[in-house]
Swiss-Prot record:
Complex formation: Monomer.
Protein family according to the UniProt entry: Belongs to the IPP transferase family.
Interaction with substrate tRNA (site feature) positions: T102
Protein name: tRNA dimethylallyltransferase
EC annotation from Swiss-Prot or TrEMBL: 2.5.1.75
Pfam families referenced in this protein's UniProt entry, alphabetically: IPPT
Residue ranges of the TM segments: none
């Protein structure tokens, strides 16, 4: 693992890793040892209503050290990386531990983010109404350079590219090519990339989802049911569609559990793929 005594207390710490790899516990350990705050860099943990299902820190963990940008976005709102950078900025002076599994957030933080106009609600609704396959086909035609850059299996990345192309008439790849300097260059941080063994991680994913069910994930989904149809990014929480399907009576709980575990493992696979391509300059932390 990591010897915390070797971490420079004068630099922000970045921790990236696939879901269920132990990022939260490491972040808290570093924050406790060095008197830091923990700041979220997970695009799903920003939403209220999903504490259990998105594996946000527990109330006890939040009491142990200050935590920020967890559950601060309304369930029905849309939230993007530009808003996250704005929300993060006030905490940078505190040399925080920035932790999460959203590679786009870390790339924007350390490499810069293009100043793209906001997406109008009608364009977003149009994007939501199209299938992933349709959006990807449009991108192949309108922004092939972006298709070569992104994980095309990630619906959020594909939809973002589609929305920018539709709203601005200009490819997202062209906007990205004009990216300004980063808010926090990687060289000014201690960047840690957790690299878990696949079989070890897959077992943890199954165990953790069962633990989530025991700790009330289904009750959490039931509480969110009345606003599910108007959910923004919160609807993309891994395991949420499966639990909602069970509550609608279209999927037995055992099948919902298995489907959610499979979806989580697929998500972790995409995260590991992103890390292999984007964290060569980070300190690799093999696990277990």
């Amino acid at each position: 693992m990591i010897n915390i005594n070797n971490i420079n207390p004068e630099k922000p710490v970045l921790i990236v890793g696939p879901t269920a790899s132990g990022k939260t516990s490491l972040a808290i350990a570093i924050a406790q040892a060095q008197g830091r705050v923990v700041v979220n860099a997970d695009a799903l943990q920003v939403y209220d209503g999903w504490r259990v299902l998105t594996a946000r820190p527990t109330p006890e963990e939040e009491d142990a050290v200050p935590h920020h940008l967890y559950g601060h976005v309304p369930f029905t709102a849309h939230y993007d990386v530009g808003q996250w950078l704005q929300d993060l900025t006030p905490f940078l002076a505190q040399n925080p531990v920035i932790v999460g599994g959203t590679g786009l957030y870390f790339r924007a933080l350390t490499q810069g983010l293009a100043d793209i106009p906001a997406i109008p609600p009608d364009i977003r609704a149009e994007a939501d109404a199209r299938s992933h396959t349709q959006r990807l086909a449009d991108l192949h035609e309108g922004d092939p350079a972006l298709v070569a850059r992104i994980d095309c299996d990630n619906p959020m990345r594909v939809q973002r590219g589609w929305e920018v192309l539709r709203a601005t008439g200009r490819p997202l790849s062209a906007w990205q090519d004009e990216t300004p300097p980063p808010l926090l260059p990687l060289g000014n941080t201690t960047p840690l990339a957790l690299m878990p063994d696949r079989d070890w991680l897959n077992a943890r994913i199954a165990q953790r989802f069962d633990q989530m069910l025991n700790e009330g994930a289904l009750d959490e989904a039931r509480a969110n049911l009345p606003r599910w149809s108007s959910a923004g990014g919160a609807a993309k929480a891994i395991g949420a569609p499966e639990l909602i399907a069970h509550l609608h009576g279209t999927l037995p709980l055992a099948a919902a559990r298995d489907a959610a575990v499979t979806a989580t493992r697929q998500y972790a696979k995409r995260q590991r793929s992103w890390q292999r391509s984007n964290t060569q300059a980070w300190q690799s932390v093999p696990l277990p």
